[in-house]
Amino acid sequence: MAANSSAVSSDGILIGDKLYSGVMISLENCLMAEERCALTPSVVDGIDVNTEIDLRCVGCELVQAAGILLRLPQVAMATGQVLFQRFFYTKSFVKHSMEHVAMACVHLASKIEEAPRRIRDVINVFHRLRQLREKQKSTPLILDQEYVNLKNQIIKAERRVLKELGFCVHVKHPHKIIVMYLQVLECERNKHLVQTSWNYMNDSLRTDVFVRFNPETIACACIFLAARTLEIPLPNRPHWFYLFGASEEDIKEICLQILRLYTRKKADVALLENKVEKRKLFIEEAKAKAKGLLPDGTPRLENAPEFSPSLKNDSPKELKANKPSPLAVHALKNCKRKVDGTKRPTSSSPVNGRVSKGRDSRSGSRSRDQSYSRSQSRSQSPKRRKSQSYSPSSDSKSRSPSRSRSDSPPHKPNHGSYKSTKGHVYGNNSDYKYQGHKRRSRSRSSSPSHSRSRESSDSGKYKKKDHYYRRERSRSYDRVSHRGYDREYHGHSHHRR
């Protein structure tokens, strides 16, 4: 009943009246055709065949050495090498780092074979292998931002391996198959033959035979090669491997691949990485040139040979954009003036109803008109000056705002009858307070008339203030004398009492 309801056809699975597409998951789907193995993505990107073979061998050696340091089982190491070979039949060595993919395959294989290892341990092991390869001193890996970036790259590489392989990561290893076939041939007691066959099988992982042939055929080839090496006779009429479904041509091809592995010279990893890097730069430059860019990504400034800017009708927006800005023109003029050594001409046009005067004519204007003097231009507003000039402070010589802002020394007024002792002290003292202002007035005054105009302007102020202080002093003197008279009178009356 069930057989009638569902039937399998070449187009899919027929269930009832509906035809469903089927997905066949089998290890035979992981095998590569001969044409696909000859034209790999790395060869398409410009890497020669020998360089690609060396890169595959080096990558598988790294996986094997890392598995030994991580104490992984041999099955996990074999799985990692097979995944490495499968991935680089779909992607190129130019676009993907060989070392990063090897780390990802080790980490993925440890989880597949139920012997997981931390990704940090995988990174440390590969770091140690690089130090041994470059003959460097053993130093621990620093956990900085570079380590975090490397960890993220390995995680991304592992996801990429899963995506490219379609999550078909199961590998059938011929280890158990070798033991089973030797039991059929009644040679399982010969430990030397078993171990040699096992060794050939482990060495064949560095080649691409696991991507091209079935594991049963590989097991037969390893037994055949071990028996020939140890000179152990096996049935040959007919050949014993016909019993297990292997052909003589496949056996010979696998044996030749394994023997070529022993005749190859040891590859220089630094030289291989240099070749890959050069090819990568060449491809990037070719892409940039095709897009009309420089190798660093900036656009080219040269025009096309048949392009004429004068023949193109510019729109108003383009004309406005092509017009130079006034700031650029002004900056260009200033640069020309600096080169020529000429001064910037002053404009004679009035600004806000006043004619702007230059720095050279400032001294003459100050001597003729007091309103243009620096002391009045820097002085405060009339209300504030009036409020501060009549402050109760008696030490107005050093704290008056008008005096602190003026650049010339104060003019000593001569009033004849009244002579202050403080004035004599100021006149004879070398540490006069306004001596620093005197130095600054010499350095900042532009002409003698400039300083004389400021002295005349300040003298009027000092005269007015001095009259005020004289009146204040006379009043205070009267009050003091009156108090003294009172004290004297009270004391005299007390004496009389």
UniProtKB/Swiss-Prot annotation:
Report what the protein is called. Cyclin-L2
Keyword Repeat assigned: yes
What this chain does, per the entry, is described as: Involved in pre-mRNA splicing.
Gene coding for it: ccnl2
Query: What keywords would UniProt list here?
Result: Cyclin, Nucleus, Repeat, Transcription, Transcription regulation
Record organism: Xenopus tropicalis (Western clawed frog)
> Which taxonomic lineage does the organism of this UniProt entry have?
Eukaryota, Metazoa, Chordata, Craniata, Vertebrata
Chief place where the protein resides: nucleus
Single GO biological process annotation from the record: regulation of transcription by RNA polymerase II
Q: Which GO terms describe its molecular function?
A: cyclin-dependent protein serine/threonine kinase regulator activity
Domain description: Contains a RS region (arginine-serine dipeptide repeat) within the C-terminal domain which is the hallmark of the SR family of splicing factors. This region probably plays a role in protein-protein interactions.
The family database entries (CDD domains) matched by this protein are listed as: CYCLIN_CCNL2_rpt2
